[in-house]
Amino acid sequence: MTEAAPKVGLLRGRFITFEGGEGSGKSTQINILAERLNAAKLRAIVTREPGGSPGAEIIRHLVLSGMGKLLGAYAETLLFAAARDDHVHTVIKPALEQGIWVLCDRFADSTRAYQGRLGDVLPGVLNALERVTIGDLKPDLTVILDVPVEIGMQRAAVRRGSGAPDRFEAEDVAFHQKLRDAYRDIAASDPQRCVVIDANADVNTVAAGVWAALRDRVLVADSSTKVTRA
């Protein structure tokens, strides 16, 4: 697919992804950051994976209901890839080309952690799917929120209340510990892009850590961005 070039004189938006295990606080922190960016007159939107576009939301319902698991790891991975392809080309890239910051709750790292590390899908398969679905699109910053497994699972249980756990929340402690380890390994393999933040702290402390990472790794590097650095 041929991508439209950004309009002349229009700065490309920044692409920030949030990753982490269940109950790590991604949704809370991504919305706090969006509010701060918009208050600073930087247009920002919040989106998510799986989902984020009409077609991808249909697939989200399918995989979180557990149907994807019944098809096997590789078929489930293809479902995630289909959702990502639609999301990238209908939401993420068009927004970035308009100078809008895109804050995404999960992206390709989640596939590498969940389907790669835990589903044993071969790296070569994941690499091939990424070439097709995202091409050269790479986050300007990936925030990995790290929280002890037991605490994350407790938070997830409180969040859903009397509702049933989704396909991934229902997994056992060992699964979630492997997931936490996978994210730490991803961060270690790409330290320029990824920052790990202790999400066991209170909401405001975590938010301050997220902002500091954005300030030091993205805002300072972008001389065109006029925003308070504190």
Curated annotation (Swiss-Prot):
Functional summary from the UniProt entry: Phosphorylation of dTMP to form dTDP in both de novo and salvage pathways of dTTP synthesis.
Reaction catalyzed: dTMP + ATP = dTDP + ADP
GO cellular component: cytosol
Similarity comment: Belongs to the thymidylate kinase family.
Organism (species): Nitrobacter hamburgensis (strain DSM 10229 / NCIMB 13809 / X14)
GO molecular function, one term: dTMP kinase activity
Protein name: Thymidylate kinase
Broad class of enzyme this protein falls into: transferase
Coiled-coil residues: none
Keywords per UniProt: ATP-binding, Kinase, Nucleotide biosynthesis, Nucleotide-binding, Transferase
One biological process term in Gene Ontology: dTTP biosynthetic process
Record lineage: Bacteria, Pseudomonadati, Pseudomonadota, Alphaproteobacteria, Hyphomicrobiales
Keyword ATP-binding applies: yes
Stored InterPro entries: P-loop_NTPase (IPR027417), Thymidylate_kin-like_dom (IPR039430), Thymidylate_kin_CS (IPR018095), Thymidylate_kinase (IPR018094)
EC number from the UniProt entry: 2.7.4.9
Cross-referenced PANTHER family: THYMIDYLATE KINASE (PTHR10344), UMP-CMP KINASE 2, MITOCHONDRIAL (PTHR10344:SF4)
